Curated annotation (Swiss-Prot):
UniProt-listed Gene3D superfamilies: 2.80.10.50
GO biological process assignments: bile acid and bile salt transport; fibroblast growth factor receptor signaling pathway; heart development; negative regulation of bile acid biosynthetic process; negative regulation of gene expression; neural crest cell migration; positive regulation of cell population proliferation; positive regulation of D-glucose import
Keywords of the record: Growth factor, Secreted, Signal
Pfam family, one: FGF
Localisation: Secreted
Signal peptide interval: 1-25
CDD domains to which the protein is assigned, alphabetical: beta-trefoil_FGF19
Family: Belongs to the heparin-binding growth factors family.
UniProt-listed InterPro entries: FGF15/19/21, Fibroblast_GF_fam, IL1/FGF
Name recorded for this polypeptide: Fibroblast growth factor 15
Domain of life: Eukaryota
Record's function text: Involved in the suppression of bile acid biosynthesis through down-regulation of CYP7A1 expression.
PANTHER family: FIBROBLAST GROWTH FACTOR
Amino acid sequence: MARKWNGRAVARALVLATLWLAVSGRPLAQQSQSVSDEDPLFLYGWGKITRLQYLYSAGPYVSNCFLRIRSDGSVDCEEDQNERNLLEFRAVALKTIAIKDVSSVRYLCMSADGKIYGLIRYSEEDCTFREEMDCLGYNQYRSMKHHLHIIFIQAKPREQLQDQKPSNFIPVFHRSFFETGDQLRSKMFSLPLESDSMDPFRMVEDVDHLVKSPSFQK
């Protein structure tokens, strides 16, 4: 009896550890793995994947707000999370992403002088950024073509931005990401434990309809 109970405890602990890793981590552009377009982004790997996030601006110029790409192509910042500043991120190459505003359906792009703006059509040269992380854990974005970091600033003319520090950002998950994790945990604890099975919570057969990747619309 004790041996059977220990088997159940081990199985439950393994499943809980897997779920914790899946829903608690913030994606970091540090490692690479091959993932299909349909798979959700759960850990730190990069592939051809899409994720829904807000981009929180943490300074040093504009701070305490969320980046938004307006329908007229301008880029500004809003204090609250809402449908207007929800962004889609897609990894188009190793540690390289495209960013698209869900509401305005415009891609974040950069001109030769470092100005950021929104385009309806994706341009591989102007709308592709390398996602980097500094020593303090902030995300920074550098244009692959122009070799300039995004400097999110509204007060100074663009010609005065040379040698300025990059803007710091924190990607914030959309609440649906955590709701999916809650659904998965709730379903797991409602299932009878089958200690003799390789899938004691029957998660493999049911997980597909619970976890879905957000679509990256063209």
